[in-house]
């Protein structure tokens, strides 16, 4: 008999297929995107004119985000929503890469890059529930390994560079024009590869210096074990509160211009994707917290606190806080196990 949490994850996968992709296709979203590609058939990337099919395929990928984040015409609601979405999603690659680092060989958590690429191709609303199904089936909070060495810093720097930098570029922050913005959107599409590459380079650098810093590694790891979650929480709260502030200011300002139909369709797509994504990740957080054996609250109360966290500090910060608490318990369990062996 399937476990209740697995039923929730499978239901979210179905909801993602129907509510995200199904609604978008039903409303003619793909036809609208084809019209954008017909107006801008090329990405403008040097050399790709010799490969028109590849060029047009990449342009189709970029065309999805352009109606929301583009400057001409400027869609303020879309840009603000995308900004807070990316700020909250910052916590997800933090979690994926952290679990990748500590997972046992053969565990599905070891393939964070593959999960990230799948998320970019199929949307995070499909990936996150599927990840939750696989992760929760094998997860045992009392047998999870502590992050080795300076992995906290490696995770944080890798996500800041690999995810944060491309995420900024999609908004054309320097007003370079349409072509550079298209390149920025495409760069963000493959951000999991940048995260993986940065992490690999940092791991090699740390490994080469491990012999000289063997004594300080454990102390450094203990004192900064939740630093990456703290940063993810700050980023998520900032995005959440800025979006609330934007809406409060919108009611006191002038009426906003009505966006194009395609921009409305993409925004609706992203909103549904956003809700399902964090419903899945917070369900996974709920599972990890309630199965740790350390929490005295009833499961429904834990779910209530997670929901309140979503409303008041944002889902990204709530996810980061839940995972930081889990990290603390893992470290305490490890220390208690060491004391018993002495």
UniProtKB/Swiss-Prot annotation:
It is found in: Membrane. It is an enzyme of class 5 (isomerase). It is a multi-pass membrane protein. Keywords: Glycoprotein, Isomerase, Membrane, Transmembrane, Transmembrane helix. GO terms for molecular function: isomerase activity. Glycans are attached at residue 224. Signal peptide: none annotated. Its EC number is 5.4.99.-. One of its GO terms (cellular component) is membrane. Its main location: membrane. The keyword Membrane applies. The keyword Transmembrane applies. Pathway: Antifungal biosynthesis. The chain crosses the membrane at residues 5-25, 81-101, 115-135, 151-171, 182-202, 229-249, 269-289, 305-325. Belongs to the membrane-bound ascI terpene cyclase family. Cyclase; part of the gene cluster that mediates the biosynthesis of the tetrahydropyranyl antifungal agent restricticin that acts as an inhibitor of CYP51 and blocks the ergosterol biosynthesis. The highly reducing polyketide synthase resH, the short chain dehydrogenase resG, the cyclase resF, the FAD-dependent monooxygenase resA and the enoylreductase resD are required to generate the first stable intermediate desmethylrestrictinol. This is Terpene cyclase resF. It comes from Aspergillus sclerotiorum.
């Amino acid at each position: 008999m399937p476990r209740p949490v697995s039923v929730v994850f499978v239901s979210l996968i179905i909801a993602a297929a129907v509510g995200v992709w199904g609604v978008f296709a039903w409303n003619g979203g793909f036809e609208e995107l084809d019209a954008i590609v017909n107006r801008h058939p090329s990405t403008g990337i040097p050399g790709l004119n010799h490969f028109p099919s590849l060029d047009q395929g990449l342009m189709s990928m970029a065309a999805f985000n352009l109606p929301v984040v583009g400057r001409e015409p400027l869609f303020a609601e879309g840009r603000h929503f995308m900004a807070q979405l990316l700020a909250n999603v910052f916590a997800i690659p933090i979690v994926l890469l952290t679990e990748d680092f500590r997972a046992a060989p053969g565990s599905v958590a070891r393939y964070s890059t593959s999960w990230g690429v799948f998320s970019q191709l199929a949307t995070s609303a499909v990936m996150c529930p599927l990840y939750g199904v696989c992760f929760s089936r094998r997860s045992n909070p009392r047998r999870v390994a502590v992050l080795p060495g300076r992995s906290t810093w490696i995770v944080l720097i890798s996500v800041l560079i690999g995810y944060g930098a491309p995420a900024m570029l999609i908004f054309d922050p320097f007003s370079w024009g349409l072509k550079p913005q298209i390149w920025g959107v495409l760069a963000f599409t493959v951000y999991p590869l940048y995260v993986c590459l940065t992490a690999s380079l940092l791991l090699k650098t740390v490994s080469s210096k491990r012999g000289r810093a063997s004594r300080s590694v454990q102390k450094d790891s203990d004192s900064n074990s939740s630093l990456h979650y703290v940063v993810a929480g700050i980023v998520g709260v900032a995005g959440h509160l800025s979006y609330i502030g934007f809406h409060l200011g919108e009611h006191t300002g002038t009426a906003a211009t009505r966006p194009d139909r395609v921009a409305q369709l993409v925004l609706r797509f992203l909103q549904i994707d956003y809700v399902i994504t964090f419903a899945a990740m917070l369900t996974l957080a709920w599972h990890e917290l309630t199965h740790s054996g350390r929490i005295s609250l009833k499961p429904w109360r834990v779910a209530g606190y997670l929901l309140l966290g979503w409303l008041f500090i944002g889902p990204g910060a709530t996810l980061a806080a839940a995972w930081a608490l889990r990290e603390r318990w893992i470290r305490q369990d490890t220390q208690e196990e060491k004391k018993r062996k002495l």
